[in-house]
Curated annotation (Swiss-Prot):
InterPro entries: GcvT/YgfZ_C (IPR029043), tRNA-modifying_YgfZ (IPR023758), YgfZ/GcvT (IPR045179), YgfZ/GcvT_CS (IPR017703), YgfZ_barrel (IPR048451)
Disulfide-linked positions: none
Protein name: tRNA-modifying protein YgfZ
Pfam families associated with the record: YgfZ_barrel
Family to which this protein belongs: Belongs to the tRNA-modifying YgfZ family.
Amino acid sequence: MVNQHTAHQLPFASQPPLASAQLAPTLISLDDWALATMVGPDTVKYLQGQVTADVSALADDRHILCAHCDAKGKMWSNLRLFHHGEGFAFIERRNLRDAQLSELKKYAVFSKTTIAPDDNAVLLGAAGAGIRELLASAFSQLPDADHPVVQHEGATLLHFAHPAERFLLVLSPEQSASLLEQLGDKVSLNDSRQWLTLDIEAGQPIIDSANSAQFIPQATNLQALNGISFSKGCYTGQEMVARAKYRGANKRALYWLAGKANQVPQAGDDLELQLGENWRRTGTVLAASQLQNGEVWVQAVLNNDLTAENVLRVREDADSQITVQPLPYEITD
């Protein structure tokens, strides 16, 4: 019998992460991510004035990656937002959740909405070849590309199409323990770095505390991920976000870079771009991961005119060489 609270309290043992094409069925403890919930009659109205997405148009069976910005249009965080129970929930990086929630709550005293962290739920990733078939043995209904959110018996299941089909499971400790018991010998286990690696490959921006309030949403490709509504009403930071679109003020984009490096850069580090015989500091690292084969993957915000021909390196790592990889979507204005 699996201890009910094992997955809830402890991350799975860390294994070197793999690219989606090499990944066997794997359950992933998402301890580096955290959940928050919002309930109450004013929740939609309140969220509508705080985030970049059109919350009133979010169907029960959809999730969306949107941004919560400051007055200058810089993102406190990005949020994976979805319907959950009687209200909404969102997932973000754990290391900035408390700071982001304090910003989100600033004006909530005037609204009938309750915003709270939720550490009772267990967040698990499920990815790798054949993972749908394995999950289908444990859940009677699974989300898919047409209906990316399913709520079932208190569990909320999210579907992601990229970089390959994967799922994010919001479970009770009991449901998590039951799933582990049922699938235990059929899946590998890994920690948050595997999910982070898949997010890098999918071009899904990862905002940690080091990069909070540093970037407008478009600098992290949020418009290309349909995370910004340009037709909804006012929200905090809207003027700057709209200006970036209509006046062409945004000159940056999010990139996936891959190659060799002696060190894995940290969130907030800069990179160096080769210009002839010289190197120039550029960009900001959002996240990075070293794979099982030794390759280093980096997600970074850089000038939006880079191409696959550009050569970059980790700062002050003369032997490193990383280049732009194709994302599974087109970067739009």
